[in-house]
């Protein structure tokens, strides 16, 4: 416990909050170039082949980012947009790739939660035709 004199001399220091997404440097998004695109397996007890990409950012960092949604068109040298947000069952993956921006296409044939996956609104005729098919 410090004395009153010590507090007058030095004062209390407030703890600085550590950023969960340091590579973004305070920005909501960052542009980057894919260096590696691959799949990896999640931690126990989950089982899958999760799609990830190693991305060199405009801020100079090289990070691992998750590719959300079913299917993607990314390959080496694709230019992508990165946002924060970790993947709970993939250690070390703290960023998400934004679907539907720059070189990343939106998820094909997606009708719900489209804005999260960069999918355009289907045409009224196409939606009716899709409903008739089923």
Swiss-Prot record:
InterPro entries in UniProt: NA-bd_OB-fold (IPR012340), Ribosomal_uS12 (IPR006032), Ribosomal_uS12_bac (IPR005679)
CDD domains in UniProt: Ribosomal_S12 (cd03368)
Disulfide feature: none
Biased composition (Low complexity): 124-134
Region of interest (Disordered), residue spans: 1-26, 103-134
Keyword ATP-binding included in the entry's annotation: no
Cellular-component GO terms for this entry: small ribosomal subunit
PROSITE patterns referenced in this protein's UniProt entry, alphabetically: RIBOSOMAL_S12
Positions with biased composition (Basic residues): 9-20, 113-123
UniProt keyword Cell wall biogenesis/degradation present: no
UniProt keyword terms in alphabetical order: Methylation, Ribonucleoprotein, Ribosomal protein, RNA-binding, rRNA-binding, tRNA-binding
GO BP terms, alphabetized: translation
Pfam families: Ribosom_S12_S23
Coiled coil region boundaries: none
GO MF assignments: rRNA binding; structural constituent of ribosome; tRNA binding
Positions of modified residues (3-methylthioaspartic acid): 89
Subunit structure: Part of the 30S ribosomal subunit. Contacts proteins S8 and S17. May interact with IF1 in the 30S initiation complex.
Similarity comment text for this entry: Belongs to the universal ribosomal protein uS12 family.
PANTHER family, per database record: 30S RIBOSOMAL PROTEIN S12 FAMILY MEMBER
Function as written in the Swiss-Prot or TrEMBL entry: With S4 and S5 plays an important role in translational accuracy. Interacts with and stabilizes bases of the 16S rRNA that are involved in tRNA selection in the A site and with the mRNA backbone. Located at the interface of the 30S and 50S subunits, it traverses the body of the 30S subunit contacting proteins on the other side and probably holding the rRNA structure together. The combined cluster of proteins S8, S12 and S17 appears to hold together the shoulder and platform of the 30S subunit.
Protein name: Small ribosomal subunit protein uS12
Taxonomic lineage of the native organism: Bacteria, Thermotogati, Deinococcota, Deinococci, Deinococcales
The encoding gene: rpsL
């Amino acid at each position: 416990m410090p004395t009153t004199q010590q507090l007058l001399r030095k004062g209390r220091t407030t703890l600085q909050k550590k950023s969960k997404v340091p590579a973004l440097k305070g920005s909501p998004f960052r542009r980057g170039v894919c260096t590696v695109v691959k799949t990896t397996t999640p931690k126990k007890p989950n089982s899958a082949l999760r799609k990830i990409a190693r991305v060199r950012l405009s801020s100079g960092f090289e990070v691992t980012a998750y590719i959300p949604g079913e299917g993607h068109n990314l390959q080496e040298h694709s230019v992508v947009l990165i946002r924060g947000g970790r993947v709970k069952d993939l250690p070390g993956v703290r960023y998400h790739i934004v679907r539907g921006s720059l070189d990343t296409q939106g998820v094909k044939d997606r009708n719900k939660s489209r804005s999260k996956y960069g999918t355009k609104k289907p045409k009224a005729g196409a939606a009716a035709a899709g409903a008739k098919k089923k």
